[in-house]
Curated annotation (Swiss-Prot):
InterPro entries: IF_conserved, IF_rod_dom, Lamin_tail_dom, Lamin_tail_dom_sf. The gene is LMNB1. This is Lamin-B1. Residues 551-565 have a biased composition (Acidic residues). Lamins are intermediate filament proteins that assemble into a filamentous meshwork, and which constitute the major components of the nuclear lamina, a fibrous layer on the nucleoplasmic side of the inner nuclear membrane. Lamins provide a framework for the nuclear envelope, bridging the nuclear envelope and chromatin. Plays an important role in nuclear assembly, chromatin organization, nuclear membrane and telomere dynamics. Residues 582-584 form a propeptide. SMART domains: Filament (SM01391). Residues 386-584 are annotated as: Tail.
């Protein structure tokens, strides 16, 4: 575990006990102290993680309650929408029936109109023939004036017939006009009905869009609440990180302050020495002045002494320059030490940031592992409930068996077990189940005797399963069952596919019979895969039989741990939760 090591503060000069310790011993003591501090911090982290888990569980309960409320509201809206949709469908059906009746009547009117047209054409042809005859009679009249008396009678009769025909033509024209008027009225009614039908369709589409917008708004509000919860947790993490960095900054500021005080003490002591030297130099200079004042009278005799004093003054000046150089070097060293300390502080900050990143990654891994463990626990509990086993630490059914005759007794405890008393070494068969699903359909159960396979729709929507295929594999053999094109598995419904010799009567849609297969088959390793109409795997379940030799309680417990590990490996890697069957 990487940890930031703070620079050691200098030990007091007078500590004899510390001087007696070796550097190795000092390093061990420092490491021990660092480990103690790290353990304390780890304990604080663990307590915080537990509190966060408690808060997370409370938030999950609140989210589940909110989802239930939203589900009830959505179900109410769904019922209201379905009622309105049923009314609209009923109205549409009535309109369709009326339209069919009108179409039938229109067909009859068209047939009558065609008959009238044919009769009119016939009468028109007769009129043309009569006119021809009239012209012939007139020609005959002109040609034969002698036959006028006899022809007048024929003429009157022909004229009367002509009048009758004209009256019939007028009546037919009136009937044709009435038929045309009725046709126009029926056409207007048809257009009106079509417009009403179109308006009803548009109203239905509008209601559907409103319903979808309400669903999207509800989902958006739900996602907004989840984002607000995640942002609150992020703020809390940032606050904790700021507090930790603040504590580290205060510690290093204290250490830098200690270094600064030591350097100031050293600088003060050296400055005091220089000041004392300067005072001594001042005293000497005063003495020299007095001597010079006294030696004015003795210039000739004391010139050599003045030269010596000048040499001493130059020596003191050199000493002052040397001390100034030393002071500048000390200042430079102090700047270097400060720069080194700042670099170490930056490195420690980077290390702390890396540690926090590692901690967040470990926390994410821990959450994923907790979800996986919860999923495995739920899966094992469901298997124990299905097999009517009492809760235990592992999902295993142990059956002891031997080849010789023996007495069998059943005991009750945390785990149901059938013990076989015999003198020989006994063997146990462990049955482990693993399942996963990526869609709405999951494989709930595989009968170990090969009688049935049970599926369940875990979603709140109906699932069409036309063209879906279920494949059973036992070793190198396989068999496939394909659903009909119209089969639909209702929301929350369970369907059982029975073998032909299971002795069960078909009861669609919950119980189906595979007439072409007498048994689903039995074996040590049974695997069932469910594929959709595109050939994509949406669910799978496997049952593994493992035979072990029971030679003692300790070996039995080790076998249980190995079986649990096999179950975990069959479920999928914990680092890939999307491939496992998460039971919420």
């Amino acid at each position: 575990m990487a940890a930031a090591v703070a620079p050691l503060s200098p030990q007091p000069r007078g500590a004899a006990a510390s001087a007696a310790l070796s550097p190795t011993r000092i390093s061990r003591l420092q490491e021990k102290e660092e480990l103690r501090q790290l353990n304390d911090r780890l304990a604080v982290y663990i307590d915080k993680v537990r509190s966060l888990e408690t808060e997370n569980s409370a938030l999950q309960r609140r989210v589940s309650e909110r989802e239930q409320v939203c589900g009830r509201e959505i179900s109410g809206l769904k019922e209201l929408f379905e009622t309105e949709l049923a009314d609209a469908r009923k109205t549409l059906d009535d309109t369709a029936r009326e339209r069919a009746k009108l179409q039938i009547e229109l067909g009859k009117l068209r047939a009558e109109h065609e008959q009238v047209l044919s009769s009119y054409a016939k009468k028109d042809s007769d009129l043309n023939a009569a006119q021809v005859k009239l012209r012939e009679f007139e020609a005959a009249l002109n040609a034969k004036e002698a036959a006028l008396a006899t022809a007048l009678g024929d003429k009157r009769s022909q004229e009367e017939e002509l009048e009758d025909l004209r009256d019939q033509i007028a009546q037919l024209e009136v009937s044709l006009a009435a038929a045309k008027k009725e046709l126009a009225d029926e056409t207007l009614q048809k257009v009106d009905l079509e417009n009403r039908c179109q308006s009803l369709i548009e109203d239905l589409e509008f209601r559907k869009n409103v319903y979808e917008e309400e669903i999207k708004e509800t989902r958006r509000k739900h996602e907004t609440r989840l984002v607000e919860v995640d942002s609150g947790r992020q703020i809390e993490y940032e606050y904790k990180l700021a507090q930790a960095l603040k504590e580290i900054r205060e510690q290093h500021d204290a250490q830098v302050k200690l270094y600064k005080e030591e350097l100031e003490q050293t600088y003060s002591s050296k400055l005091e020495n220089i000041r004392q030297s300067s005072e001594m130099h001042s005293c000497t200079a005063n003495t020299v002045r007095e001597e010079l004042h006294e030696s004015r009278m003795r210039i000739e005799t004391l010139s050599s002494h003045i030269a010596d004093i000048q040499k001493e003054s130059r020596a003191w000046q050199d000493r002052v320059h040397e001390l100034e150089d030393t002071l500048s070097k000390e200042r430079e060293n102090y700047r270097k030490i400060l720069a080194e300390n700042e670099r170490e502080v930056a490195e420690m900050r980077n290390q702390m940031q890396q540690q926090f990143s590692d901690y967040e990654q470990l926390l994410d891994v821990k959450l994923a592992l907790d979800m996986e463990i919860s999923a495995y626990r739920k899966l094992l509990e469901s298997e124990e409930e299905r097999l009517r086993l009492s809760p235990g630490p592992s999902s295993r059914v142990t059956v002891s068996r031997a080849s010789s005759s023996r007495s069998v007794r059943t005991t009750r405890g945390k785990r149901k077990r059938i013990d076989v008393e015999e003198s020989e070494a006994s063997s146990s068969v462990s049955i482990s189940h693993s399942a996963s699903a990526t869609g709405n359909i999951s494989i709930e159960e595989i009968d170990v005797d090969g009688k049935f396979i049970r599926l369940k729709n875990t979603s709140e929507q109906d699932q069409p399963m036309g063209g879906w295929e279920m494949i059973r594999k036992i070793g190198d053999t396989s068999a496939s069952y394909r659903y009909t094109s119209r089969y639909v598995l209702k929301a929350g419904q369970t369907v059982t596919i029975w073998a032909a010799n299971a002795g069960v009567t078909a009861s669609p849609p919950t119980d189906l019979i595979w007439k072409n297969q007498n048994s689903w088959g039995t074996g040590e390793d049974v695997k069932v895969v469910l594929k959709n109409s595109q050939g994509e795997e949406v669910a799978q379940r496997s049952t593994v039989f493992k035979t072990t030799v029971n030679e003692g309680e300790e070996e039995e417990e080790e076998g249980e741990e190995e079986i649990l590990e096999d179950v975990i490996h069959q479920q999928g890697s914990p680092r890939k939760p999307e491939r496992s069957c998460v039971v919420m």
